[in-house]
Amino acid sequence: MLYKGDTLYLDWLEDGIAELVFDAPGSVNKLDTATVASLGHALDVLEKQNDLKGLLLRSEKAAFIVGADITEFLSLFLVPEEQLSQWLHFANSVFNRLEDLPVPTISAVNGYALGGGCECVLATDYRLATPDLRIGLPETKLGIMPGFGGSVRLPRLLGADSALEIIAAGKDVGADQALKIGLVDGVVAAEKLRDGALAILRQAINGDLDWKAKRQPKLEPLKLSKIEATMSFTIAKGMVAQTAGKHYPAPITAVKTIEAAARLGREEALVLENKSFVPLAHTNEARALVGIFLNDQYVKAKAKKLTKDVETPKHAAVLGAGIMGGGIAYQSAWKGVPVVMKDISDKSLTLGMTEAAKLLNKQLERGKIDGLKLAGVISTIQPTLEYSGFDRVDVVVEAVVENPKVKKAVLAETEAKVRPDTVLASNTSTIPISELASVLQRPENFCGMHFFNPVHRMPLVEVIRGEKTSDKTIAKVVAWASKMGKTPIVVNDCPGFFVNRVLFPYFAGFSQLLRDGADFRKVDKVMEKQFGWPMGPAYLLDVVGIDTAHHAQAVMAAGFPQRMQKDYRDAIDALFDANRFGQKNGLGFWRYKEDSKGKPKKEEDAAVDSLLADVSQPKRDFSDEEIIARMMIPMVNEVVRCLEEGIIASPAEADMALVYGLGFPPFHGGAFRWLDTIGSAKYLDMAQQYQHLGPLYEVPAGLRDKARHNEAYYPQVEPARPVGALKTA
C-alpha cells in the first residue's frame, strides 16, 4: 500500500502501474474538501516513485464519484472571497498535478461521474466507461459554475459547442453520447472495465498510443478561429439569455468565462474560472439553489425512512377516469404498478384511457419507448364500470368530482368492495380528510393523496394525515407515491391542506390589488419577470380554472373565515358570473386560441376590462415593489402559520412543496429561504406597511418573535475551514 486515506487509497497494481481507488465510507464517493486534500497527499507519494509507468483511477462503489459534497457548500460559500479563491487555487493545483504526471493516466468510470467527479476524470489522459455512465457538469443548476477546471478542460476536449451545451444547461450525458462527442474513449461491460483500462494504459506505456499528444490540447488555448468563436459564443449567450433569464446568473457567467479564456492556456484560463466562480458562490441564488438540493435530499430521505417497514403496493386502483384519473393511472402503470381504473360511464373511461395512451405515444414519438413497451404499459391499466379486480388492490385513490357528498358516497361504496387492509385515499384538493373519513368504517385506512395537474409533470404529491389516519396508511401511500416517481410530502389535515391553503391568500392579495385599481396585466408581468413565477396570478387562475378557484375560494373562506372571508365582490366572482372559466372554455382574464401545436395561447381581450371595472376602483399605477409585497405577504404569512400550527413539519418540506407544487421560483429557494434572505426583521417592517389591508397581512406571532431576536428559520451555518487550503487550513 503506497498511501491510505479516509476516502481513497493508492497501491501498485502491477510492474510500474499504480492504482488510485476512491472508496469512501458509506454507499457513494463524493469529492469533498477532505478528499481533494487526500488526493493531493496521494500525488505527493506518486511524484516520488521513480519507477512509475502509469496510473489507473477507479472506484470501489457503484458510481465513480457522484460529485462534490453539496452539504459542504453553504458553509463553503460563507468563506470570504479571498480565502475561497485560495482554496480553489489549491484544489486546482491538485488536479493540475494529476494531469501533469510524467506518465499516462486513465480513469475507469462506472455509474455517475458528475460535477467534481467529471472534472477529476477530465484531468486524466484517457477515460473508459461502463454502459451505465452518467457524466456531466450540473453546477449551473446550483447557481455556480465548474470550479475544478471543468470550464477549461471540457471545451478543449470536446470543442466549444458541445462543452457549452453541457456546462450552460448543467447537463449530464449517457455512455453512448459521451463516446460520440469524445468525452470518453470507449465503453465496455462493467466486468471488463478494469482490464480494459489496463489494456489501454499498457498501450500508452508501450508507445502504441500517443498519450502526450492526447493531453496537449487541454493545456493550450481553444482551437477556434475568430469567426467560429464569434458564432459559437454569440449563439450560446443568446440561448442562455432565452432559457435561464436574468434570475439565474450562473449559465451566462460560465459562457462568458469560457469565451474570455478561449485564447489562453490552462493556467491563465483557470485563473479566470476562479475569478468567475467565487462571486457566484456568494450570491443569494446559489444559496437558494443549493438549499433546494439539500431540502430535496432531506425530503427523500424522510420518505425512505418512513417506508422502510412497509411493502410498496403491487396493485392500485383509481376511482374516476377523466384527465386526472387517466394521468394517475398512466403514472402508476408507467412506473410498474398495475392499476384498475373505474368510472360510472364509458365516455369517462374512454377519456381516461385516451389520456394514458396520449402520454405513452409522446414517449414513443420521443424514442423513449418502443411499441412493445407501450403495449405492455397500457395493458396494465384495466378500465372497468364495475368493481372487478378491486379484491386484489393494495391502495385505491379517489379522483371524482370535488363535491363532498359525491366523494363520501363513492368512498363508502368502495370501502365495502376492498380487502380490510386496503388503503383508501382521496385526491381532493380542498375538502378536509377527517370530514370525508366520517362515513368510513375504517378511517385509520384512509388519507389524502393530492396530485397536481398535469400528473405526469408535477413532482409533488401531498399526503394528508386525517384525525384517525394510521402511520401504516401514511407509509403505504408514501411508498406508492415514491414508486410513481413523485416527491411525497406528508401534511396534517386542514381546509386546503398546505399548498392550496397558502395559494389562496396569494390570490386574495391579487383580488385586493385589482379592487384597488391595479391592472392585472402589469401584476402578471411583475410577478413573472421581476419575482420569477412561471405564471402571473391572472394567468395561473385561468389555467387552474376560474370556476375551480371560485369554488375553492368559498371552501377556504368557510375554513378560515377570519382571514379568508371577503366582504366585497372580486374579479374571480365577476369572471365566474360571466362564464369566463379560463383556458377550459377559452375565456378568462385572457382569451385563448390554439397555436399550431394545439396548445392554448393567450391573447388580450378588451371585454374583460369592462367586467373588472364593476369590481375595481379607477385604474392607478402601483410600483413593482408594492405589487410584490402585496402579493407575497399573505402567502408567506400563511406558510408561517402552517409551520406554527404543525400542518407542515419543517421549513425544508414547506419550501419543497412550494417549489414542486406551485412553481415557487427556485432561485428564491422557497418562502422560508426567501424570508431568511430578506431577514425576519426587515420582512416585519415591510408587512407592517400593509396591515391596514386586513388580517391576511397580519404577521403571525412566531414570526414577530423571530424578528425581535433577528432569528432565521433555517439553521445558520458557520464558514467552512476547507482542508488543504493555503491559509485557512
UniProtKB/Swiss-Prot annotation:
Gene3D superfamilies: 1.10.1040.50, 2-enoyl-CoA Hydratase, Chain A, domain 1, NAD(P)-binding Rossmann-like Domain
Keyword Transmembrane among record annotations: no
GO CC, alphabetical: fatty acid beta-oxidation multienzyme complex
CDD domains: crotonase-like
Enzyme Commission (EC) number: 4.2.1.17, 5.1.2.3, 5.3.3.8, 1.1.1.35
Signal sequence range: none
Pathway in which the depicted protein is active: Lipid metabolism; fatty acid beta-oxidation
Residues the record lists as binding substrate: 296, 500, 660
NCBIfam families in the cross-refs: FadB, PRK11730.1
Function: Involved in the aerobic and anaerobic degradation of long-chain fatty acids via beta-oxidation cycle. Catalyzes the formation of 3-oxoacyl-CoA from enoyl-CoA via L-3-hydroxyacyl-CoA. It can also use D-3-hydroxyacyl-CoA and cis-3-enoyl-CoA as substrate.
Family: In the N-terminal section; belongs to the enoyl-CoA hydratase/isomerase family.
Subunit structure: Heterotetramer of two alpha chains (FadB) and two beta chains (FadA).
Protein name as it appears in the record: Fatty acid oxidation complex subunit alpha
Protein species of origin: Klebsiella pneumoniae (strain 342)
Gene this protein is translated from: fadB
